[in-house]
């Protein structure tokens, strides 16, 4: 685990302990009972692949540790609607506050504004967070293999499955990919960003994609700015992409989303 991830785990553990003291697991279960059923995150992406279309997980992200504030006029419901109108298949919503200025209410509001399934984008360490995610309306959670033991990953995956949620398993190198493939989730995300240096290189996806059997659905993450980037990764078998920052910086998010997916109008420019 990198120093960055260790620091994140430390504050997340504190957050989790505080949350448990405020809201019991029984209360979360009650809130989950009042939620509508999960929308089918993997199913939405698989449907795009079935039709030989690019599948986009469009990210709602206000800020990041490496870039600071990304979008000052931050309106999650409006962004969700723009993404949906532009052709996105799913949403990813940051709920981590210290590093990304995210919040649970951003997830709830974005999902309520459209019909797309939503991922809780956060650092998951405890099954309590899985219950939180479903109580807030999430249809999918993220597991970052660099921050988890195999036992933790299995435990979190099982908790999500029991709640009818999907799991996106994120990797950055071959060792993490081998571990991810021992999980049952069909969704494997390859993060092209090095969490030690924050450098981004699409060659990471090109190296790791051949390791993945055809029954898994690969997601390219980070460093995807243009339709040409999507076409480049398509050659490796990756036709699903998680994109946030480059779209978040655009005035017309709907048009930028459409351009990224189809190549029409002006492609999304690298920031």
UniProtKB/Swiss-Prot annotation:
Keywords: Amino-acid biosynthesis, Aromatic amino acid biosynthesis, Decarboxylase, Lyase, Tryptophan biosynthesis. Its EC number is 4.1.1.48. GO terms for molecular function: indole-3-glycerol-phosphate synthase activity; phosphoribosylanthranilate isomerase activity. The keyword Lyase applies. It catalyses: 1-(2-carboxyphenylamino)-1-deoxy-D-ribulose 5-phosphate + H(+) = (1S,2R)-1-C-(indol-3-yl)glycerol 3-phosphate + CO2 + H2O. GO terms for biological process: L-tryptophan biosynthetic process. Pathway: Amino-acid biosynthesis; L-tryptophan biosynthesis; L-tryptophan from chorismate: step 4/5. It holds the Pfam family IGPS. It comes from the Bacteria. Disulfide bonds: none annotated. Belongs to the TrpC family. This is Indole-3-glycerol phosphate synthase. It comes from Sinorhizobium fredii (strain NBRC 101917 / NGR234).
